[in-house]
Amino acid sequence: MHEGMMWGRIAAGSSWYTFPDDEMTSLRDVAEHAGVSVATAWRVTHGADSVRPETRERVELAMRELLYVPATRPEATGAIGLLLPEFANPVFAALAQAMETYATRSGLATILCNTAGSALREVGYVHMLLERRVERMAFICAEVTDVRSDHAHYQQLIDRGARLVFVNGASEALEATSVGVDERAAGRIATEHLLELGHTRIGFVAGDAFALPTREKTIGRDDALRAAGIEPNGYVAHGPFTVEGGRTAMSALLDEHAADPPTGVICSNDLMAIGVLQEAVARGLRVPDELSVVGFDGIDAGGWTQPPLTTIEQPIDVIAKTAIAALSSELDDPDLALANYVFRPRLRLGGTTAAPPLRKAARRAPGRARAAPR
């Protein structure tokens, strides 16, 4: 190991993958990491047959772990790598489609990479992109959003001069462009909407507790509650960012607070909100008469529920356009290339929110109090 070199690690089961924190990895680094001579490492990188399979495997593993790319490849291509955690999530698909459209208009090809939410798979795709001299990459809701993660592989990309954009997820530890929605404002706007309707027991069906967007929405919700004179309560349940995750979290929330259930719920995304609606139906709760629900994202499927979902809509098209501009030659100014673009979401009213049951009863009370004439 070179003197003064710093190392970062990420875990995968019982394995640790190591990345140097310095500038572009040299062939000597690969040789040392694999425990072979530089000459042997050179033969592997140039496809020579005179290397034992087990030795070749060690060298190739070192190349992947160190993001090493032989310097004999062609120059950088006019393409971008677009890495997202899954294709099934409608908002990821919408972002990818919009970004591909704007990339094409900018003369850039797009290579889509499904990381399946795996840091190691993400690193594998990064290495594949670098091998093909793709030096511009956009990460949608990537591993960087996990506050527990070691972000060393992103830093290494930055050190080697790659142009990165983080979409809907960033890290304060990295000097890179980020483009996304104001998650804290989203949590605040959703909560304020329910407060204005008269709700005070406002739950949060939240995604992964270690995801930065979840933490930001939590802060926004708590800020809105405190501003209304309500101390943030324990009406919070976490689950995966899926329909089933939302339903399971809502079930846990209702079971935990059976004696005093929430009358309104905000959700980390629209998929989770749809799961909340399913759980409400299963329990015989009428939406919005007995339970109000607010989602986040503004996906088309939110308009297909009955009643249509009230949600906090993020500006997908603007986010996509800005992200591609940051990756293209339109933003060669270093100051602009490191900017953070944060866009405010907006409330989109559907039919899943209304005044809480007690407020409705109070409104009807005067009429019921009058005695009918005899």
Give residue ranges: language-model regions.
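Short acidic/polar active-site loop segments enriched in Thr and Asp
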Residues: 135, 200-201, 263
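Proline-centered loop/turn at the N-terminus of a beta-strand
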Residues: 109, 135-136, 161-165, 177, ...
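Short beta-strand-centered segments that line the small-molecule binding cleft or hinge
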Residues: 123-134, 138, 144-185
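Hinge/beta->alpha junction and helix N-cap segments in small-molecule ligand-binding domains
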Residues: 54, 84-94, 112-121, 143-147, ...
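Flexible loop/turn connectors
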Residues: 2, 7, 13, 27, ...
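N-terminal helix-turn-helix/winged-helix DNA-binding helices
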Residues: 17-24, 63-97, 106, 116, ...
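N-terminal helix-turn-helix DNA-binding module of bacterial transcription factors
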Residues: 1-77, 357, 362-374
